């Protein structure tokens, strides 16, 4: 129900050439050089068959996630760090290489992203008996994510990456894992986006999370909204017609 027209389609595998062509028109000079350096490192060290938990090619995932990061206007080094967000998994001396190829600021951002990735991987929300306890645990996780980073852009990048994951999930079949990721998104990441005032990502995360968790209810609501939209447009057109006729009489 929330528009995704400003980003790539869920099923599209973004190539480095497409990515560079897109951002070459937006950045130049030192900023573009940083992004090109990050891309070269990712192309060198990400295995060709590397994929995310949901099956998206890793390089395409991080490149696609930068489109969401770019919407937040948090500078070129954040885009470069997003591209390199999986580098710690595949390269032991990634810190040295990142600092040499890019700069220390990007290295620190990638370090923060790596810490957040590990936290969310090993501290997922447990199945608890009462909704109150579940809510308390989710709130603790959100506070921890904010408290542990020295640069809030790390959390914003993580939100953008989760948004890309949710976006990509529209192209794959329903599964328990898909519903689990959707629930985690609704429990942790959508409220976190709300707390940080990142409204566009909040709406996307809530919309897609509900869609994957409750596809039948989502379809019913979407249909009702479409019907109401038709009624609203008909009403607006009628009002415009009345106004135009009255103006013609003047």
Name each model feature, range by range.
Residues 1-250:
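Active-site helical microenvironments for divalent-metal-assisted chemistry
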């Amino acid at each position: 129900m929330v528009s995704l027209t400003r980003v790539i389609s869920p099923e599209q595998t973004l190539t480095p050439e497409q990515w560079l062509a897109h951002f070459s028109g937006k950045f130049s000079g030192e900023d573009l050089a940083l992004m090109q350096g990050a891309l070269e490192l990712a192309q060198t060290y990400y295995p060709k068959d590397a994929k995310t938990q949901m099956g998206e090619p890793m390089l395409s995932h991080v490149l696609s996630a930068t489109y969401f990061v770019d919407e937040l206007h948090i500078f070129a080094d954040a885009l470069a760090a997003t591209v390199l967000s999986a580098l710690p998994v595949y390269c032991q001396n990634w810190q040295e290489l990142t600092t040499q190829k890019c700069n220390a600021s990007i290295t620190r951002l990638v370090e923060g992203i790596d810490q957040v990735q590990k936290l969310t991987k090993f501290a997922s929300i447990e199945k608890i008996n009462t909704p109150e306890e579940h809510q308390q645990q989710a709130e603790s996780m959100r506070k921890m994510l904010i408290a542990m980073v020295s640069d809030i852009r790390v959390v914003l990048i993580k939100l953008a990456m989760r948004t890309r994951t949710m976006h990509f999930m529209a192209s794959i079949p329903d599964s328990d894992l898909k519903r689990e990721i959707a629930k985690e998104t609704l429990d942790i990441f959508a409220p976190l986006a709300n707390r940080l005032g990142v409204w566009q990502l909040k709406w996307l995360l809530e919309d897609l999370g509900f869609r994957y968790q409750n596809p039948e209810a989502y379809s019913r609501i979407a249909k009702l909204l479409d019907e109401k939209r038709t009624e609203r447009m008909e009403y607006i057109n009628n009002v415009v017609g009345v106004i135009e006729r009255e103006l013609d009489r003047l």
